[in-house]
């Protein structure tokens, strides 16, 4: 890890809770002087679908047996360099430089069809925000890029050069829930160039008619453009759907989200696949079997202590569920 990459090491959110969830336990062992009691020594294959700087992965590795495997995914080239360094010192780690939306195909290329646990920490990481050159921050100057993977795809600046006002406004509204999307979109499209995040943030600030105290007026617009350019919500949907065939029965799914657009998707997915539904055709004499792919999901938020130590954790939610093999017939009232 380079000195620059070390400077961006950050605290993983809901660290203990997420790792315990993906291992299917209520809590990790308390650390004692007896090292033999400090690890669950879990065997199997696990996936950290968003490696970042490896906070969750490192704690998970401490709980895995020597014969276990941890596969880590990330789109960010810097994150991949950190992951590869970890893999060079721990043979249990395998690295995939790609989106977790490629989960099934990437695992198949390794000869893996099912895993024991899936974990993801969605959205943008603190190191990405704090590195102004990436373009994610409206508080630090940099190129208007915002790509998670800077080695491929179109930057936000390139997209803004060609997008029309209406499409931009729709993106700001749909992915940022920005109520003043049309006014802001018109102001953005009147800019002569898109080379500076601070310039872009200032234009949005001036165009925004109603500032919320304690919240920068460019917050939702930057979020919207980032989510759109990286297809974040589409990737989340693909990842969740792939979790059904990829997880073994008894395997664990644990996903951390930071805003309502992500959290709503996870919530609805788990609700849909954790309880039976009657068929849409009411004329059928009896409902067909409906697969129940997950147990009743649970949700956990950060503690007051974690929020105090890491204010960026305040909006985080961890949703978790266990993969089941239950196929059942919905009860019918006579």
From Swiss-Prot:
UniProt cross-references to Gene3D superfamilies, sorted A to Z: Putative methyltransferase TM0872, insert domain, Vaccinia Virus protein VP39
Compositionally skewed regions (Basic residues) per UniProt: 289-301
Cellular component GO terms, alphabetical: cytoplasm
Region described as Disordered: 272-318
Subcellular location: Cytoplasm
Chief place where the protein resides: cytoplasm
GO BP field: rRNA base methylation
MF annotations from Gene Ontology: rRNA (cytosine-N4-)-methyltransferase activity
Binding site for S-adenosyl-L-methionine: 54-56, 74, 100, 121, 128
Catalytic activity: cytidine(1402) in 16S rRNA + S-adenosyl-L-methionine = N(4)-methylcytidine(1402) in 16S rRNA + S-adenosyl-L-homocysteine + H(+)
Keywords recorded for this protein, A-Z: Cytoplasm, Methyltransferase, rRNA processing, S-adenosyl-L-methionine, Transferase
EC number(s) per entry: 2.1.1.199
Record keyword Ribosomal protein present: no
NCBIfam families: 16S rRNA (cytosine(1402)-N(4))-methyltransferase RsmH (TIGR00006)
Task performed by this protein: Specifically methylates the N4 position of cytidine in position 1402 (C1402) of 16S rRNA.
Name used for this protein in its record: Ribosomal RNA small subunit methyltransferase H
Organism name: Psychrobacter arcticus (strain DSM 17307 / VKM B-2377 / 273-4)
């Amino acid at each position: 890890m380079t000195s620059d990459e070390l400077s961006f090491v950050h605290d993983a959110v809901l660290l203990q809770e997420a790792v315990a969830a993906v291992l299917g336990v209520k809590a990790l062992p308390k650390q004692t002087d007896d090292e033999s009691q400090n690890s669950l020594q879990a065997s199997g294959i696990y996936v950290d679908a968003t490696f970042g700087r490896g906070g969750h992965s490192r704690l998970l590795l401490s709980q895995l047996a020597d014969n276990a495997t941890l596969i880590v995914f990330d789109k960010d080239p810097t994150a991949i360099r950190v992951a590869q360094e970890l893999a060079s010192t721990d043979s249990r780690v395998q690295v995939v430089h790609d989106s977790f939306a490629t989960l099934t195909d990437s695992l198949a290329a390794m000869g893996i069809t099912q895993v024991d646990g899936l974990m993801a920490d969605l959205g943008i990481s603190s190191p990405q925000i704090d590195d102004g050159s990436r373009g994610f921050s409206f508080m630090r100057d940099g190129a208007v890029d915002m790509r998670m993977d800077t080695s491929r795809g179109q930057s936000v600046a390139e997209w803004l050069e060609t997008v029309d006002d209406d499409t931009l406004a729709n993106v700001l509204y749909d992915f940022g829930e920005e109520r003043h999307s049309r006014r802001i979109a018109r102001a953005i499209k009147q800019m002569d160039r898109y080379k500076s995040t601070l310039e872009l943030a200032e234009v949005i600030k001036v165009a925004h008619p109603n500032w919320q105290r304690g919240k920068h007026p460019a917050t939702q617009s930057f979020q919207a453009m980032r989510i759109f350019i990286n297809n974040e919500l589409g990737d989340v949907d693909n990842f969740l759907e792939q979790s059904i065939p990829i997880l073994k029965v008894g395997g664990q799914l644990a996903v951390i989200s930071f805003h309502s657009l992500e959290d709503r998707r996870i919530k609805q997915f788990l609700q849909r696949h954790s309880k039976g539904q009657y068929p849409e055709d009411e004329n059928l004499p009896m409902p067909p079997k409906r697969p129940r792919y997950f147990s009743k999901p649970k949700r956990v938020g950060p503690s007051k202590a974690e929020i105090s130590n890491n204010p960026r954790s305040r909006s985080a939610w961890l949703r978790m569920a266990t993969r089941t093999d239950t196929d059942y017939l919905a009860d019918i009232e006579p």
